[in-house]
Amino acid sequence: MSALRPPLIGSRSRNMNLKFRHKILLSACGVVVLAFALFTLYNDYLQRNTIRQNIEASVQQSGALTASSVQNWMSGRILVLENLAQDIGQQGAGDTLAGLIEQPSYTRNFLFTYLGQANGEFTQRPDAQMPAGYDPRQRPWYGAAANAGQTVLTAPYQGAVGGLMVTIATPVKSKRNGELIGVVGGDVTLDTLVEIINSVDFGGIGHAFLADANGQVIVSPNKDQVMKNLKDIYPGSNLRVAAGMQDVTLDGQDRIISFAPVAGLPSAQWYIGLSIDRDKAYAALSQFRTSAIIAMLIAVAAIAGLLGLLIPVLMSPLTTMGRAMRDIAEGEGDLTRRLAVQNKDEFGELATSFNRFVERIHASISEVSSATRLVHDLSEKVVSASNASIIGSEEQSMRTNSVAAAINELGAATQEIARNAADASQHASGASEQAHGGREVVEEAISAMTALSQRISESCAQIETLNASTDEIGKILDVIKGISQQTNLLALNAAIEAARAGEAGRGFAVVADEVRNLAHRTQESAEEIHRMITSLQVGSREAVHTMNTSQVSSEQTVQVANQAGERLASVTQRIGEIDGMNQSVATATEEQTAVVESLNLDITQINALNQQGVENLNETLRHCDQLAQQAGRLKQLVGSFRI
C-alpha cells in the first residue's frame, strides 16, 4: 500500500497547486461556458430546423408560382394553335388558309406558323424558302401529332434563327367527315420563359431553372448549363428530378435543390428547379453563433470579476483557520492548543472537527509513548536471548559436521567394497560366459571333425570307385587301340588294291589314305588317354592313402576335443559358484551403502536445519536491532510532541 502512495500524490499535484478560490473561480467559469454552449447548440438546432422549414416553404411557394406562370404562358399558345386548327377544320385548307395563318394573334405568339397537309403540301407564315423535296409528313412534329390525335409539345431544340425553341403541333380534322386534313404547328421561342425563370429571386441566395423529367436543363441563368443533364452538372450527387429538397455540391459549394412540376403540358414533363446557396441560406445562423460566443466571453469575464471580489470575503474564516493550523503544525508539536470556534457554519463545524481530531491524537500519542518504552525494553531482552541461542546453535553445528564427515568416510569405504565386489562378480560372469562359449566352440569342433571323418571315408570310397572305373576305361582303350590297328591295316590293303586298279581306283585310294590317317590319329589319342588314366590311377591310390591317414588323425582329434569339453564344463561350474558368492557380497555391501547414505542424508538434513536455525536467529537478531532502532526513533518522535 505504501508503494502506491507516491504516484497518487504525484497525480494530484497539479490540482493541489491551485488554491481553493481559484478552483471555485474556474468551476464557475466552466459552468457558464457549459450553459452558454448548451444554449447555443440547442438554439442552433431550433434555428436550423426553422430556417430549413422556411426555405422549404418559400421554395415550394416560389416553385408553384413559377410553374403556374410557365403553364399559363404555354397553355395560352396551345389554345391559340388549337383555335387555328378548329378554324381550318371548319373552313378547309382552301384559298382562305393563308389569311387564317397570317392573323396577328398567330404572328405575335409564334415565330413561325405552318400547316402540313396530308397530301404533302406545306404552308408557312411568315413565308420562307424550304429545301427542295421538303415533305412535312416526314417531320417529327407531324408524325407525333398525327399519331397522338391531340396536341403535342416537342423537346427543346436550337432553332436556325430564333435561338432555343419548342414546337407546338396539333392535328387538323375536317368538321364534315372527321378525316385528317393535316397538322398545324407553331414555333415558340423560350425567351419569355427565360425572363419568367430569371425573375425568380431569393434575395441573392439562389436562382430557378427549367428542366425536363430526364434531367436535361432547358432554361437557366447560367447559360453553360443549358441543354446539359443534371448528372453532368452535379457529378456524383445522385440528384433526382422529384419533389422534395436535396443537398448537392457544385464546385465545392453546398447547394439545396428542389423541383416543382409544371402541370397541364401535353406530351411533356417539365419541372421548375430551384437552386439555393446553403451557406448564404444559413448565414443568419452563423451570425447568431458569433454573437453567442461574444456574449459568452463577456459573461465569463463579468462573473470572473465578481467572484474575484466576493471569494476573498467569503473565504476569510477559512483563511484564519488555515493560519491557526499552520501555527500548530509548524510549532513544537503542541497538542494542547485548540482552534477558536466563532461561527456555526461549515467553517465552524470544520474547526470543531479539527479540535476533536487533535484531542484523539493527544490521547493516542500518550499511549504510544508508554508502549514505545515497553517495546524498547522487550527488544533488548530478545536480542540477549537470540545471542545465546546463536552460540548454542553454532556449537551444535560443529558437532553435527564432525559426525557427517565420519559417516561420509564410512560411506566411501562401503561404496569402494561394493564396487570391487560388483567388478569381481562382473568379471566372473564374463569368465563363465567365455567358458560356456569355449565349450560350445569345442562341441561344434567335435561335430565338425566327426562330419569331416565321415566325408573322408566317403571320399576314400569314391576314389576307390574312380580307380576301378579308370581300370575299365583302360580296358576299353585297349580295345580301341586294337580297332585302330585293324583299321590301319584295312586302309593299307585298300590303298594297295586301289593302286592295282589304276585310274579307276584313284578315288578309292584317296579315301583309303584318309581312313589310314584317321586310324593313326585315333591310335595316338588312345595312347595319350591311356597315359593320363595311368597317371590318374597313381594319384587316386595316393589320395586313398592320404584320406585314410586323415581319417585316423580326425578320430584322434575328436577324442582330444571331447576331453577338453569335459574340462571346460568343470571350469564353468566353478566360475558359476564364484559368481554367486560375489553377488551375495555385492548385495550385502549395497545394503550397507544404502544404510550409510540414509544416515548421511539424515545428518545432512539435521545440519541444514541447524544452519537454517542459525540464519533465522541471525535474522531475528537483525530484526530485533531494527525494532530497537525504530523504538528509539518512535520514542524520539513521541518526545517531539508536547502532551
Swiss-Prot record:
Where does this polypeptide localize?
Cell membrane
Q: Where are the transmembrane segments?
A: 24-44, 293-313
Every Methyl-accepting transducer domain range: 371-607
Q: Which GO terms describe its cellular component?
A: plasma membrane
Q: How does it sit in the membrane?
A: Multi-pass membrane protein
Cystine pairings recorded for this chain:
none
PROSITE patterns (alphabetical): CHEMOTAXIS_TRANSDUC_2 (PS50111), HAMP (PS50885)
Q: What are the residue boundaries of the Cache domain, all occurrences included?
A: 49-273
* Record keyword Kinase present: no
SUPFAM superfamilies, sorted:
Methyl-accepting chemotaxis protein (MCP) signaling domain, Sensory domain-like
Give the main localization category. Answer: membrane
Pfam families in the record: dCache_1, HAMP, MCPsignal
Q: Which InterPro entries match?
A: dCache_1 (IPR033479), HAMP_dom (IPR003660), MCPsignal_dom (IPR004089), Sensor-like_sf (IPR029151)
Q: Which family does it belong to?
A: Belongs to the methyl-accepting chemotaxis (MCP) protein family.
- The protein's name is Methyl-accepting chemotaxis protein McpA
Q: What does UniProt list as this organism's lineage?
A: Bacteria, Pseudomonadati, Pseudomonadota, Gammaproteobacteria, Pseudomonadales
